[in-house]
C-alpha cells in the first residue's frame, strides 16, 4: 500500500489514496500503523475515497490513532487538499468533499496555504453531544475534584473549551483525559485550553479525543475562537498560536460559516506491506 506522511503544524497524518488503491482498515491495523516505534506513526489516518455524490470531488474519512473513526479534523482537511493535488487526483483549487456528517469546501491558495470552510459552529448541546438542558455561553462542570467553567461547541466533532491564565502551565495532561471521557460527553470530546492574549490573538493547547495532546488541532482552534466570540472575548478574526504553529480563524457570528487558514506540509511518500 502506498501512502504519504504529512503534517499540519506538527499534527501528523498518514494519508492513503483509496481512489486508485483497494484498501481496508480495521481498528487493529490502524493501531499498529499508528505505533511510532513499530509502525508509521501518526495522530490520525486520512483516507481519500471516491465521492458518493456526483456534485462532490471526494469523500474524506478520518481515523484516530486508537482506531476510532471521527467526523472532523481541520488540520487533516488541509493536508487532504494538498494530497489530492500533489497526487494528481484533481487539479481544482476549490475541492468539495463529504465527511461522516456533512460537506466541506477546501481551497488551496496561491501561496500554498489551505482555507477550509468549516461550516457554522453548532452550540446546541444535542449536536455536540453534551448533556445539558439548554444552550449556555458557559457551563459548570465537576471534574478531578475541581469546578470547571467551559464552553461547548460542535465543529462537526465535540469540543470543550476552558479559558486559562497561562497555557504553558495548564493541566492539559491531567485534566484533559478526565474531561475527554466525562459522563456529560457521551461520545467523548476534544478539550481545549485557551489563553486570551488579546481580542485578535489566543494561545491554545488541545487534548484530542483518541489521540491525546497534539502539536495542533485545527477544529480545536476553530472551536476555541467560536466559543471566545460567543462569550464576547474575541474579535471576528483571530490568530491562534498552537505548539506547532499558527492558524488564522475568521467567523462573523451566527448564520455564517467559520473559516480556517493554515499550512499543510508533505513530508515523504512510502510503501508498506500489510
Curated annotation (Swiss-Prot):
Biological function: Catalyzes the stereoinversion of LL-2,6-diaminopimelate (L,L-DAP) to meso-diaminopimelate (meso-DAP), a precursor of L-lysine and an essential component of the bacterial peptidoglycan.
EC number(s) stated in the UniProt entry for this protein: 5.1.1.7
InterPro entries, A to Z: DAP_epimerase_AS (IPR018510), DAP_epimerase_DapF (IPR001653)
Record has Isomerase as a keyword: yes
Name this polypeptide is given: Diaminopimelate epimerase
GO cellular component: cytosol
Known catalytic reactions: (2S,6S)-2,6-diaminopimelate = meso-2,6-diaminopimelate
Matches recorded under Pfam families: DAP_epimerase
Amino acid at each position: 500500500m502506498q501512502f504519504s506522511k504529512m503534517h499540519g503544524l506538527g499534527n501528523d497524518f498518514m494519508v492513503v489514496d483509496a481512489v486508485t488503491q483497494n484498501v481496508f482498515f480495521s481498528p487493529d491495523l490502524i493501531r499498529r500503523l499508528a505505533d511510532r516505534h513499530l509502525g508509521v506513526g501518526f495522530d490520525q489516518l486520512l483516507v481519500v475515497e471516491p465521492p458518493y455524490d456526483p456534485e462532490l470531488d471526494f469523500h474524506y474519512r478520518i481515523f484516530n490513532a486508537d482506531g476510532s473513526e471521527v467526523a472532523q479534523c481541520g488540520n487533516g482537511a488541509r493536508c487532504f487538499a494538498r494530497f489530492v493535488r500533489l497526487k494528481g487526483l484533481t487539479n481544482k483549487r476549490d475541492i468539495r468533499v463529504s465527511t461522516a456528517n456533512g460537506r466541506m469546501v477546501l481551497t488551496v491558495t496561491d501561496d500554498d496555504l489551505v482555507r477550509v470552510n468549516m461550516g457554522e459552529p453548532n452550540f446546541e448541546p444535542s449536536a455536540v453531544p453534551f448533556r445539558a438542558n439548554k444552550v449556555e455561553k458557559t457551563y459548570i462542570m465537576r471534574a478531578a475534584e475541581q469546578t470547571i467553567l467551559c464552553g461547548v461547541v460542535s465543529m462537526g466533532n465535540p469540543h470543550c473549551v476552558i479559558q486559562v491564565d497561562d497555557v504553558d502551565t495548564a493541566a492539559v495532561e491531567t485534566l484533559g483525559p478526565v474531561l475527554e471521557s466525562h459522563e456529560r460527553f457521551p461520545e467523548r470530546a476534544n478539550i481545549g485550553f485557551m489563553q486570551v492574549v488579546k481580542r485578535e490573538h489566543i494561545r491554545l493547547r488541545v487534548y484530542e479525543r483518541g489521540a491525546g495532546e497534539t502539536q495542533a488541532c485545527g477544529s480545536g482552534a476553530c472551536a476555541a475562537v467560536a466559543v471566545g466570540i460567543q462569550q464576547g472575548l474575541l474579535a471576528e478574526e483571530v490568530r491562534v498560536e498552537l505548539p506547532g504553529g499558527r492558524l488564522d480563524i475568521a467567523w462573523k457570528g451566527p448564520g455564517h460559516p467559520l473559516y480556517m487558514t493554515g499550512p499543510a506540509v508533505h513530508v515523504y511518500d512510502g510503501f508498506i506491506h500489510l
